[in-house]
Each structure stands twice: as C-alpha cells, then as structure tokens.
Amino acid sequence: MSTFHFDLVSPEMVAFSGDVDQVDIPGAEGDFGVLAGHAPVVAVIRPGILTVTAGANKQKIVVLGGIAEVSDKGLTVLADVATPAPDVDLQDFAATIQTMEQQIPGKVGDELDRAIERLDHFKSIQHELNTTAMH
C-alpha cells in the first residue's frame, strides 16, 4: 500500500507528523478516509475520533473541530484540539459533557441546535472512548 505524509497540528503542539497508509477523519459532512492519491479537498472537521493507520499500527486521536486539507503534498489537519485517545481524562470529559447539558436550557433557536449537535458529538466520542477502554 502506498503511503503519504500526514501532519496533525493543534495550537498546543504537533500531535502527529509522518508517513501513513490511511487517515479516517470525522468530517462535518460525514466521516471520510484519506489514502495516497486522494483528490485535493478542504473539509471542516467535527468533534470526533481521527484514526491514523501506519502499517499494522492504528492510533486514535480525539479532535474537537478543525480543518483538513488534502493536497499533492499529503494531508494536513489543523485541529482546534488534538489529544491521543489514551491521554483523554474520561472524568474530565464526562464533566465537560455534564456542563454542556446544563447549558442547553438557556439556549434557543440556532444556538440551541448547534449546542445539541456539539453535545451529541461529545457523547459519541465518550461512548467510543469508554468502549475502547474496556478492550
């Protein structure tokens, strides 16, 4: 399988930089996978789990939004937050979800819709992290 270069950058750090076989991205319009030779594209990333495959190794990284750009030079993801899944503090993440739930009643209209959508994404991440942690 052909490889391509992948950079995952957040404001705090370069979370990943190297050659990979595949990257699965939680896109705002739906999840998508990137392989070598992928057509150029720029996509918005929703909160979710990004999966990096390099050989037999898979690494899961929690991203909380951002932008992905595929070009002839490879894939670059500029993430608002990027944390390797094993480094996520599950109690802190649960507390964040609880705070988000408590803030829902004060929102209306489009703001309410966006808050519910973001909460759903966070709950999906939490579910996957809890499921993964058990295996």
UniProtKB/Swiss-Prot annotation:
CDD domains in the record: F1-ATPase_delta
Keyword annotations from UniProtKB, A to Z: ATP synthesis, Cell inner membrane, Cell membrane, CF(1), Hydrogen ion transport, Ion transport, Membrane, Transport
Gene3D superfamilies in alphabetical order: F0F1 ATP synthase delta/epsilon subunit, N-terminal
Keyword match Ion transport: yes
Record's bilayer topology term: Peripheral membrane protein
Regions annotated as coiled coil: none
NCBIfam families: ATP_synt_epsi, PRK13448.1
Subunit-level organization: F-type ATPases have 2 components, CF(1) - the catalytic core - and CF(0) - the membrane proton channel. CF(1) has five subunits: alpha(3), beta(3), gamma(1), delta(1), epsilon(1). CF(0) has three main subunits: a, b and c.
Protein name: ATP synthase epsilon chain
Organism: Rhodopseudomonas palustris (strain TIE-1)
